[in-house]
């Protein structure tokens, strides 16, 4: 548990650095990290995502309702994916579908977030 909290804090700080220069009103990495922190077990190879994880995914999708918000969320996810040791890339890419939502990009360190549109 302590390791997970430490990782979440590192991800949060990294997300803040990435998003700080973006336009005001864009979704924050803090919100993304908070919404998706229950997904950490699944993203590192655990069994299917928990109901709390899927609830966070759905909450994030609902909050990201403009192009700048979706691009900001994408950048946060991209940064977080790069900072999670032992990230299971297949689980990361499958997460939205496992939670019954559709996002227009893969959760990956190679995603070009500038192409994400609402």
From Swiss-Prot:
By its UniProt entry, which InterPro entries does this protein fall under?
A: Bifun_inhib/LTP/seed_sf, Bifunc_inhib/LTP/seed_store, Plant_nsLTP
Report disulfide bridges, numbered on this chain.
29-76, 39-53, 54-99, 74-113
Q: Where is the signal peptide?
A: 1-25
Q: Give the keywords, sorted.
A: Disulfide bond, Lipid-binding, Signal, Transport
Question: Taxonomically, which superkingdom?
Answer: Eukaryota
- Gene Ontology MF, one: lipid binding
Q: Which PANTHER family match?
A: NON-SPECIFIC LIPID-TRANSFER PROTEIN 2-RELATED
Q: What does this protein do?
A: Plant non-specific lipid-transfer proteins transfer phospholipids as well as galactolipids across membranes. May play a role in wax or cutin deposition in the cell walls of expanding epidermal cells and certain secretory tissues.
What's the protein here called?
Non-specific lipid-transfer protein 6
